[in-house]
Amino acid sequence: MELIPDLPETVAYECLLRSSYKQFPLMASVCKLWQREISLSDFFRHRKASGHSQELVVLSQARVDPVKELVSGNKTIPTPVYRISVLELGTGLRSELPPVPGHSNGLPLFCRLVSVGSDLVVLCGLDPVTWRTSDSVFVFSFLTSTWRVGKSMPGGPRSFFACASDSQRNVFVAGGHDEDKNAMMSALVYDVAEDRWAFLPDMGRERDECTAIFHAGKFHVIGGYSTEEQGQFSKTAESFDVTTWRWSPQGEEFLSSEMTMWPPICAAGENGDLYACCRRDLMMMKDDTWYKVGNLPADVCNVSYVAIRRSGNLVVIGSARYGEPSVGYNWDMSNSRWLKLETHDKYEGHVQAGCFLEI
């Protein structure tokens, strides 16, 4: 059977490669051959190699329209309602994903977002009405534009944990705290394709409010603090090698002193470059030492999310301070210049979490 009748196979395949990710659900419904083709990992490798992939920044972002109000005594406390917004970096277009199943009151607060292949994984968070810790897992497929409910995270309630993915199949989770605010040293891995959780060996120390990245085949957990050191962020880091299934320390001084006042927002590039946004500084690690490579623009210095594009350029999302509009910038590493991304009133709400997806 031909991909497209009366067209050479190479030309027909090129047509599929050039399609927008938003057309994937429609393409999958055309015929089984198209559905199978766009589901193959080779399709996305060819799409990326030919320069037709699309870079997306996916955010847990508050709605800007009138917020839902929670009445407490004589006071009215505004409670932002969060939803998932998508920024297409190539075009600047923004959109919103369908609501997460069973969450008419918005996304769980402080949930974590991770991309795995062409899927988005939403992990845990706090119920926006009761503020109870959730162990829920939801997976959104950009191929079908549908949600599915994943297996709940085991091990009891956990919030403010670090997570990262290998971008292919697995999501790694570590640290955070339980319902009694006790910092945790346990870690888990979630196989998205198999919808299966497994426990990893414990880390070497408790790490609440830590951050994480995945690169060079390792899951790196950075900073955080123990139960007895509430708010005193550690300079240390440790990494989990998926091949040896073991943790190893990254040294007692992985972070510099000025980077422990508040947890840095980190990102790792495909070439191994490691960047961190810390207060007003853009930092880069070279030869195991952090160097300042630039100043963050004033209206984005309260950073919510940072990602490294395939070109090596950085995308930073944030605001001047909490309550101010969220904006985005692209940092060109070739000339160290910042370019402000186009803004839209509808998508200026506070951002709690984000992830990067190339599809």
UniProtKB/Swiss-Prot annotation:
Pfam family, one: Kelch_1
GO biological process, one term: regulation of phenylpropanoid metabolic process
Keywords: Kelch repeat, Repeat
Domain of life: Eukaryota
Residues in F-box domain copies: 2-49
InterPro entries (UniProt xref): Kelch-typ_b-propeller, Kelch_1, KMD1-4
Repeat (Kelch) residue spans along the chain: 119-167, 170-217, 219-269, 271-310, 313-358
GO cellular component assignments: cytosol
Keyword field contains Repeat: yes
Name of protein: F-box/kelch-repeat protein At1g15670
Organism: Arabidopsis thaliana (Mouse-ear cress)
